[in-house]
């Protein structure tokens, strides 16, 4: 299972993350630097939400232009705490990214799901080119991640969980059979990386079998 840490400019933390084999999650609302890491590209909606600002379309498009082609995947714009209404925004951007950004044609696009979503809402979109980003509240993520991971596998798609900052939640991700997760704890506090990475490396038999069967 792949761990992504929020991009940081702190050299000590970057060195620790690199040594542990983690990757970076680069936000469209942050510095567009990869620090030489493999990376994924986040749409920046969470940062806008935290600042009580509207979604920054210009920042997202700039990030896609500069970093999209090299990303492991791109998180399609969503509405934080928007419920199923978020899917309308995501579908709009999903179509735009697929048909107007030729340079990212090989990069998987991840649709963010959250409280209020049901598999039937997104299953027509899923494929090896379109995966699932599990957002929403912590409780909802923990209750539903196994279902979303199984759905993604059935469509040959990636399943990623956002904002995972404890060893317990990393173990839940592993048991659910997801492909990757991201969090900010290891970026901000190098001392937390070791327990988080130990949890990442602990293979859960059910999760391992599920991923191998995909």
Predicted regions and their residues:
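Glycine-rich phosphate-binding active-site loops on the catalytic face of alpha/beta enzymes
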Residues: 137-138, 174-204
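Glycine-rich adenosine-cofactor-binding loop
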Residues: 130, 135, 141-170
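Alpha/beta enzyme core
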Residues: 66-69, 96, 100-104, 116-132
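Catalytic cores of alpha/beta
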Residues: 54-62, 120-125, 159, 165-183
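Conserved, mostly hydrophobic/aromatic
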Residues: 42, 111, 173
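Non-catalytic, usually N-terminal nucleic-acid engagement modules in DNA/RNA processing proteins
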Residues: 1-98, 210-213
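Distinct, well-ordered alpha-helical segments
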Residues: 87-92, 117-127, 144-148
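Glycine-enriched alpha-helix->loop->beta-strand junction motifs that scaffold or abut catalytic
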Residues: 19-23, 36-37, 70-71, 107, ...
């Amino acid at each position: 299972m792949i761990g992504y840490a929020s991009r940081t400019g702190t050299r000590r933390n970057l060195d620790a993350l690199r040594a542990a084999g983690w990757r970076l999650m680069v936000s469209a609302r942050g510095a567009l630097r990869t620090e030489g890491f493999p990376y994924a590209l986040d749409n920046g909606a969470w940062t806008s939400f935290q600042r009580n600002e509207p979604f920054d379309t210009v920042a997202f498009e700039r990030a896609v232009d500069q970093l999209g082609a090299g990303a492991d995947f791109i998180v399609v714009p969503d509405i934080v705490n928007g419920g199923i209404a978020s899917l309308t925004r995501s579908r709009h951007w999903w179509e735009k990214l697929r048909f107007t950004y030729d340079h990212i044609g090989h990069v998987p696009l991840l649709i963010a799901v959250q409280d209020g979503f049901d598999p039937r809402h997104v299953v027509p979109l899923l494929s090896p080119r379109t995966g699932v980003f599990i957002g929403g509240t912590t409780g909802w993520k923990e209750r539903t991640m196994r279902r979303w991971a199984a759905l993604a596998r059935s469509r040959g798609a990636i399943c990623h969980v956002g904002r995972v900052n404890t060893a317990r939640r990393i173990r839940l991700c592993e048991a659910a059979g997801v492909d990757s997760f991201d969090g900010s704890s290891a970026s901000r506090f190098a001392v937390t990386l070791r327990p988080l990475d130990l949890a990442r490396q602990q293979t859960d038999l059910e999760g391992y079998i599920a991923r191998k069967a995909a």
